[in-house]
Amino acid sequence: RWKVFKKIEKMGRNIRDGVIKAAPAIEVLGQAK
């Protein structure tokens, strides 16, 4: 039961890290238009 929770937690952290890394690129693309 705990392994599933840990897996979801890790996945959520990966998604959050991806959003944080992508945010500046999205801003640059938005300014370029």
UniProtKB/Swiss-Prot annotation:
GO BP annotations listed: antibacterial humoral response; defense response to fungus; defense response to Gram-positive bacterium; innate immune response; killing of cells of another organism
Tissue specificity, in the record's words, reads: Hemolymph.
What are the UniProt keywords, alphabetically?
A: Antibiotic, Antimicrobial, Fungicide, Hydroxylation, Immunity, Innate immunity, Secreted
Q: Which domain of life is it from?
A: Eukaryota
Record's subcellular location = Secreted
5-hydroxylysine occurs at K21
UniProt-listed PROSITE patterns: CECROPIN
Report the InterPro entries cross-referenced here: Cecropin
User: Matching Pfam families, A to Z?
Assistant: Cecropin (PF00272)
The entry's cellular-component GO terms read:
extracellular region
Give the induction text: By bacterial infection.
- The keyword Secreted belongs to this UniProt entry's keyword annotation: yes
Function noted in UniProt: Cecropins have lytic and antibacterial activity against several Gram-positive and Gram-negative bacteria. Also has activity against fungi.
Family per similarity comment = Belongs to the cecropin family.
Quaternary structure and partners: Monomer.
Identification of the protein by name: Cecropin-C
Organism annotation: Heliothis virescens (Tobacco budworm moth)
